[in-house]
Amino acid sequence: NIILQDKTGIMDGKIWDPNSLGIDDFDALDYIDVVGDVTSFAGAMQLNIKRVRKAAEDEYDPADYLPVSENSTDDMYSQLKAFIGSVENTYLSALLKKLFIEDEEFIKAFEGHSAAKTVHHGFIGGLMEHTLGVTRLCDYMSKAYPVINRDLLITASLLHDIGKTKELSSFPLNDYTDEGQLLGHIYIGAQMISDLAGQI
């Protein structure tokens, strides 16, 4: 018994003879290519699987299987870099660049994470979309109230949820990690910033 899922819903799948030709090994949460017949059992649709194999990375688009931001990741990342480029304070700029420009592992995690499990922006790209929304509001407020330190406010808005890259697991799970359960994203993010600041 397996459960098949895409962004439209789930369906039960049955592999009646796991040792037959055409049934390749795969693990839970793998993207798989299946061939089979759809039947109805107890009022529900199920797929009797004849062939299955693990799909190669270039054979699928996660957007077809998981909730994804309607905004382009590349466009959002360009907007994020523009905000970073607008920060004039040398140290704050260096801090942002070290994380959002130089740290490829972090960038990949940030682009692919949600902002929450279910409450808001619970989809791939949700963390970046949420962060940009907060940063736009802060940018507006800094123009409306010139007494505000814009560089500090923009930096804080860009960094405020970075701990969520460690608090939540990546998709398709999008669930709390042990570290996330024990520490929470605010503490995790503060520690990440402290570690980065120590390198500047």
Set out the residue ranges of the language-model regions.
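A short mid-domain helix/strand-loop element embedded in enzyme catalytic domains
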Residues: S93-L137, L159-G163
